[in-house]
Amino acid sequence: MRFFVSCAKGLEYLLVDEVLALGAAGATATVAGVNVEGGLCDAQRLVLWSRLASRVLWPLAAFACADEDALYAGVAALPWVEHVLPGQTLAVDAHVSGEAITHARYAAQRVKDAVVDTLRDAGVVRPSVDVEHPDVRLNLSLRKGRATLSVDLGGRALHHRGWRQAPHAASLKEHLAAAVLLRAGWAKVYAEGGGLLDPMCGSGTLLIEGALMVADVAPGLSRYADPDAMSHVSVAERPVLLPSRWRGFDVVAWEALVVDAQQRARRGLAELRPVLHGSDIDPRALGAASANARAAGVQDAIEFVVAGIDVLPAVSEPHGVVVCNAPYDVRLAADPGLYRHLGDALRRVVPRWRAALVCGSNTLAFATGLRAGKRYQFFNGALECVLIVCDPVVPLAREAGGAQALSEGAQMAANRLRKNVQRLKKWRIRAGVECYRVYDADLPEYAAAIDVYQEVDGARRLFLHVQEYAAPTSIPEGDVRRRRHELLAAVRAVFDVSVAQVALKTRQRGKGGSQYGCFAQRGEFFHVCEHGALLRVNLFDYLDTGLFLDHRPLRGRMAREAVGKRFLNVFCYTGVASVEAAVAGAAATTSVDLSSTYLHWCTDNFALNGQGGVRHRLVQADALAWLEAERGQYDVIFCDPPTFSNSARADDFDVQRDHVRLLRAAVARLTPGGVLYFSNNFRRFRLDVDAVAAFAQCEEISSVTIDLDFSRNTRIHRTWLLWR
């Protein structure tokens, strides 16, 4: 006999394995479920034992269904006196797709009408409706003009285990928790003496499911436990009710299954070791977790501690599994920073453990900074999630700072990196440079720019920012990936950093040309220093980092010239030039940008250096329009526009087309003796010398604004000095 077992999307193949392990003759995955070959006893065993299934549906009939009349007739043709006893309660669930019948509730009503009418005509007391706890629950699937009517052998959704005493916001459903534990290989780790840790355990779902799984407790024992039984009685001793009172249900087989399951539960609970650890920052959540664990009979195996992720509970087991349903969407606004802190904590406390983390998206998974060996998609209700498995949290080759053997290509790249580091060493020490470009496509086959950022506080970590250049379409994608991995291996080996300290921006080929792929969204900011100013940078979340390294010498020159003067920075980005001018002693600064994000970043940079107030003004505006309306005068002006920009709040800007208008407006704001520095990185830019000569004197000074680390690419930007 073929019957259907439904599950959450993404769990189908796990469910196939479970169904076969529980004795079914065959199983085939389909969307959100599994078609199973087996008998009624096999189906009832799944009701009792499956940790993954949502429902077990035993078919009663399948028939063509062109419209509501055909549906009614098909249902009425069944001998309902053989399925429903007089006076029993009934419920009908319906799932419809297609054009014949479009409303599931109406379809369910027509099924109920057909059943009731048939029983009434047979002289049987009609069943009443009980949608919560019916004696018999029917399930209608109507798809592509064909109806399948089944009896729901479990009587209710099987993710209900019966032990949950107190609901908790956005708890992971129990069958999804079981899937996480199975993907993590928890049972095998437990058998080898390992432990289980959930640092954001909430109401304890993952830990309780983990305990019941290794204790060999069937989920159906607590789900169908007699509610009148004493709550202090072990789940292995409580009377177990029938999940369905459908007349075809094999009561004798069910009772035999229950007796066997209770015997196994007694043994498993008696031998269960206390190696499960949970923590959460919310004491109320832990109160619910403790109550749930008591109801499940596993309270002695789980230790609950009130703590945030920065203070993980101490674990004595040398190895184990970390599981976590990190907050996303409904429970808390998705916070990449929280995911980053989680990854940092796991690397620090349990580097050799395996981790299986439920994340709200791939972006949030990337934010952990952990290297996922495996990645799975599934649905928690309507929410699509990603499960990452990291085994171990810190790979052995990474823990020692990248001591793994390098391939021939990676070794070649590493040699070039070491050579560049040595070449720049004396200059960096003399100039006090801590953030610099160490590589710029020196080897053509490894086409990327690599920048080094030295953290100035905390652990003084070293970070690497790797920006891959677009590969020619003639190069196979496999070669592109191989070279990328070799270059990253070289970076980690030379600079002795973990994968979490390397930010990679890759180019992805598409119809619109090469575009950078999605960024990590780790929310990880740290501080660096340039020319005595502290600066906030983020290597992971944006295309740029908050600090254009190539403008370093120009910023230093302007800061020296701005001492005691008024400094204007248009298209200010994160305001680094303004901050350095303020730190150097500028009398006042004005910073203009259209982006509120960058202006907030600029505000943070000023605050880091104890600067701010009315002397340092930030203006959110279209820079060109603001310049043309401004009447103030400035001694030093810095103008570094983008090549092109468009915005719903401002006119489109094209540096080649609009630079004369821009420079005219900026020069008009200069005081007598004032200077304007104009820079851009458009490689094909041509200054309209004749037009500019009509209102200013001009000199190109690009060569003196390029430091040694950018000497391989002197076209990284061009700079002109203008004065009246």
Swiss-Prot record:
It catalyses: guanosine(2445) in 23S rRNA + S-adenosyl-L-methionine = N(2)-methylguanosine(2445) in 23S rRNA + S-adenosyl-L-homocysteine + H(+); guanosine(2069) in 23S rRNA + S-adenosyl-L-methionine = N(2)-methylguanosine(2069) in 23S rRNA + S-adenosyl-L-homocysteine + H(+). Residues 42-153 form the THUMP domain. Its EC number is 2.1.1.173, 2.1.1.264. GO terms for molecular function: 23S rRNA (guanine(2445)-N(2))-methyltransferase activity; RNA binding; rRNA (guanine-N7-)-methyltransferase activity. The keyword rRNA processing applies. It comes from the Bacteria. GO terms for cellular component: cytoplasm. Keywords: Cytoplasm, Methyltransferase, RNA-binding, rRNA processing, S-adenosyl-L-methionine, Transferase. Transmembrane segments: none annotated. It is found in: Cytoplasm. Its main location: cytoplasm. InterPro entries: 23SrRNA_methyltr_KL (IPR017244), RlmKL-like_Mtase (IPR000241), RlmKL-like_Mtase_CS (IPR053943), RlmL_1st (IPR054170), SAM-dep_methyl-trfase (IPR019614), SAM-dependent_MTases_sf (IPR029063), THUMP_dom (IPR004114). CDD domains: AdoMet_MTases, THUMP_AdoMetMT. Belongs to the methyltransferase superfamily. RlmKL family. Specifically methylates the guanine in position 2445 (m2G2445) and the guanine in position 2069 (m7G2069) of 23S rRNA. NCBIfam families: PRK11783.1 (NF008748). This is Ribosomal RNA large subunit methyltransferase K/L. The gene is rlmL.
